[in-house]
Amino acid sequence: MNEYQTFDFASLRYSHLKNGFWGHRTENYMEIINSQLEALLCPTNSARLLNFGIHAGEVDDKFYGEYWSDGDCYKFLEACIYVYQNTGDLAVKAVVDKYIPWIVASQQEDGYLNTQITLTGKERWSKVIHHELYNIGHFLTFASAHYDITGETVMLECARKLANYTYGVFKDYPRELAH
């Protein structure tokens, strides 16, 4: 974009899938949500909400999953928020609300948020393969959607804390490294 172009954010709050190709694929949303939730709560699934529950003290286990596990959980919760926005079904919002305290408990005091690092003792930012920025990006989009659709600020505050932490880590790096 140049100085003469502008970009206005189009809130998904004004978008609804009612019929047609995608509209008809949303009719069984609770069945799909429950199926995905069951997978994310499976102790041996590569993406696990349970990792957040460990931080919250509600799950007695150790980290299990892939480097991108947190990101997959955020994408699921973001999808649920969009379904809630489209349907108004409080059962969908309750799914998201149940795991928000787990995410809050997983965030470190300095704002860092990544269970595969904090639960395993790995050094932060030591290997690009750890997908830390990938997971952060997915969290920020989930938190933004959550705030935009619900007006609730708990995830937005976590996102702000995480963004400030991330900025502090990378602010002194050369701009050429950004891509």
Where are these regions (language model features)?
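Glycan-recognition and catalytic cores of secretory/periplasmic carbohydrate-active enzymes
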Residues: 1-179
